[in-house]
Amino acid sequence: MDLRAEQQQYNPYRIFSRSEWAKLRDDMPMTLAADEIAALRSMHDRLDLTEVEEIYLPLSRLLSIYVASMQRLFVAQRRFLGIQDRKVPYIIGVAGSVAVGKSTTARVLQALLARWSPGPKVDLITTDGFLFPNAVLERHGLMQKKGFPESYKLPMLLAFLSDIKAGRAPVRAPVYSHLTYDIVPKSWIEVSQPDILIVEGVNVLQTGRLPRDGRAVPVVSDFFDFSVYLDAEEPVLRDWYVKRFLALRDTAFHDPRSYFHRYALLSDDEATATAIAIWERTNRANLEDNILPTRPRATLILKKGADHVVEQVALRRL
């Protein structure tokens, strides 16, 4: 969908072409070297100096304005209430389909924001660690719905974010292995009072059903101060997923510890057919039923073309 087409009706977003958005960088300095940018790029994603300059530096500048505004509001509220409250981290959510490039975007933002003056502490977690272990998913018949909302330990994720917002430290998050495709037992990431926390995951903008009794039911995005949705057309996403699957077949799948080790010796045709089947059965269904409907809840939408380059940017009006 062309985001500009929606401007024929009332639209809560301001839509920018790539060139229009790039001009909003103003004097935001480039703080990453070419080799650092290359290290931030995920497999089969595209990230270069131009993409950082034209897309991510304007976003970094925008976020610096939002964060500073939130800090001023926090100080004013504390003065109004007459209390000395703990520092409240600014939380940024990064959402979007499998294979769209969420991890790359999250890492780039972490690198850029950490180099603001005077050097804020910027942490990054993914919601993968809050998935149920494979044994639990298998027991409940949910392995084919891994990544769907029901496959996550939602109360645990909500408790984690609540503790972060409350300024508690340290707060622990479980570790997920993409090699074994499972939670790593007795392994944790510790987050200790960051200035900014980036939370990346497919369903972080998901809403819950409204309760009939009127009681508040928190959702993950309730804890976000800003959110980014990575967008691309479904056929493009499928193509990226298939290409990534083929690349992993030639690399990570050859590790005997890999959950997908059984696919390591597939031919190109067999691997392509397998990847398409997985996409249609799981990832496309999750995209259409759970992920795409949350796009209108994002603060900012980055729309990518088939070459992985951001073509349009939509910023929610205040």
UniProtKB/Swiss-Prot annotation:
EC class (word): transferase
Subcellular location(s) of the protein: Cytoplasm
Annotated Gene3D superfamilies: P-loop containing nucleotide triphosphate hydrolases
Binding positions for ATP per the UniProt entry: 96-103
Residues making up the signal peptide according to the UniProt record: none
Listed GO MF terms: ATP binding; pantothenate kinase activity
Entry EC number(s): 2.7.1.33
Biological processes, Gene Ontology terms: coenzyme A biosynthetic process
One family name in Pfam for this protein: PRK
Catalytic activity reported: (R)-pantothenate + ATP = (R)-4'-phosphopantothenate + ADP + H(+)
InterPro entries assigned: P-loop_NTPase, PanK, PRK/URK
Annotated Gene Ontology cellular component terms: cytoplasm
Keywords: ATP-binding, Coenzyme A biosynthesis, Cytoplasm, Kinase, Nucleotide-binding, Transferase
Pathway(s) where this gene product acts: Cofactor biosynthesis; coenzyme A biosynthesis; CoA from (R)-pantothenate: step 1/5
PANTHER family: URIDINE KINASE (PTHR10285)
HAMAP family: Pantothen_kinase_1
Family, as annotated: Belongs to the prokaryotic pantothenate kinase family.
Protein name, UniProt field: Pantothenate kinase
